[in-house]
């Protein structure tokens, strides 16, 4: 599923104006009969625009995180994420860039900035690996199961296949091979293994599987793909694992779950960004921009902005995500 990758995009014009004003304060931008528009006059208008304020916030975040974590984000990773996104959008990619006022280089910068924040968030999340958090994650953890799934694209098709799958003596493997649209499992008769921390299986499918007894077949499971479409799953549970009473038996898996949860936690991400901005001793000199920074740092005479600037740095989409184990490049863009 393609995800929005330019939710936090702003026009290059705003970026250029904010970057240039300090070097050309009195310069005329436009002249006309009886009047002129100077850089200062334009700046006074642009700086009160929400998109322009987000630009400045993103510029500050980029510079601060680049200074501290730049060596930890490789150019190859940025390039790979960019190419993955470009492939996902296909022939529409150039048009989407243009609609959002971005060049390819500007989009790569967005991806890099987001990766810098992702790295910082992951490092901060690793500090949350306390026994208490391990035990909390363990309480909600379901060990690996072996299941078979059939995925179809319409509810009518799903009902038709479900009737076959629940028929006495039904060969679920053969039904999956003949009907499933899931390329990763179809030729294996739908077989797949996952636990509650797996990110390559929809949550609704996991929930349905965990509720079954061995050899049980679920009802039709609806998984929304977007606002306007959905996929439909039928799940058969093949084998369950007994859950150990000792959380340490699952420590590696629980570690991944804890970190993944933190990477999707907007409040946690915002706290990481806030700490980095505070450590950088950032000061906001123009009162017009105080509100957008107030979510992260104390600014004299400012009030908290009603819109969340965390969207300019959060992971997806993820990480957002679901899909965090096989991220689309969209989760690498600043949202």
Curated annotation (Swiss-Prot):
Its main location: membrane. Its EC number is 5.2.1.8. One of its GO terms (molecular function) is peptidyl-prolyl cis-trans isomerase activity. Residues 300-335 are annotated as: Disordered. Residues 1-20 form the signal peptide. Pfam families: Rotamase. InterPro entries: Foldase_PrsA, PPIase_dom_sf, PPIase_PpiC, PrsA_foldase, Trigger_fact/SurA_dom_sf. Keywords: Cell membrane, Isomerase, Lipoprotein, Membrane, Palmitate, Rotamase, Signal. It catalyses: [protein]-peptidylproline (omega=180) = [protein]-peptidylproline (omega=0). It is a lipid-anchor. GO terms for biological process: protein folding. Belongs to the PrsA family. This is Foldase protein PrsA. It comes from Streptococcus sanguinis (strain SK36). The gene is prsA.
């Amino acid at each position: 599923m393609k995800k929005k990758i330019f939710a936090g995009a702003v026009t290059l014009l705003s970026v250029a104006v904010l970057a240039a004003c300090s070097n050309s304060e009195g310069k005329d931008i436009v002249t006309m009969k009886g009047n002129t528009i100077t850089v200062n006059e334009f700046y006074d208008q642009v700086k009160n625009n929400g998109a322009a304020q987000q630009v400045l916030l993103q510029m500050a975040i980029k510079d601060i995180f680049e200074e501290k974590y730049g060596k930890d984000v490789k150019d190859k990773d940025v390039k790979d994420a960019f190419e993955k996104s470009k492939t996902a959008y296909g022939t529409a990619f150039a048009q989407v860039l243009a609609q959002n006022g971005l060049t390819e280089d500007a989009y790569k910068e967005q991806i890099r900035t987001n990766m810098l924040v992702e790295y910082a968030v992951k490092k901060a999340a690793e500090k949350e690996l306390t026994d208490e958090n391990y035990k909390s994650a363990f309480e909600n953890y379901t060990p690996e199961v072996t299941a078979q799934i059939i995925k179809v694209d319409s509810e009518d098709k799903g009902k038709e296949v479900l009737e076959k799958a629940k028929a006495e003596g039904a060969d679920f493997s053969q039904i999956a091979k003949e009907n499933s649209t899931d390329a990763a499992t179809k030729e294996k008769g739908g077989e797949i293994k996952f636990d509650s921390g797996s990110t390559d299986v929809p949550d609704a499918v996991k929930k349905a599987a965990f509720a079954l007894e061995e050899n049980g077949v679920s009802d039709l499971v609806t998984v929304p793909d977007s606002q306007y479409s959905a996929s439909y799953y039928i799940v058969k549970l093949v084998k369950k694992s007994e859950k150990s009473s000792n959380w340490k038996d699952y420590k590696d898996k629980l570690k991944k779950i804890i970190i993944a949860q933190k990477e999707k936690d907007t409040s946690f991400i915002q706290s990481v960004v806030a700490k980095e901005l505070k450590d950088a001793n950032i000061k906001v000199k123009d009162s017009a921009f105080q509100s957008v920074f107030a979510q992260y740092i104390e600014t004299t005479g400012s009030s908290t902005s009603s819109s969340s600037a965390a969207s300019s740095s959060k992971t997806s989409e993820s990480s957002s995500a679901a899909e965090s184990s096989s991220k689309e490049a969209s989760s690498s863009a600043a949202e």
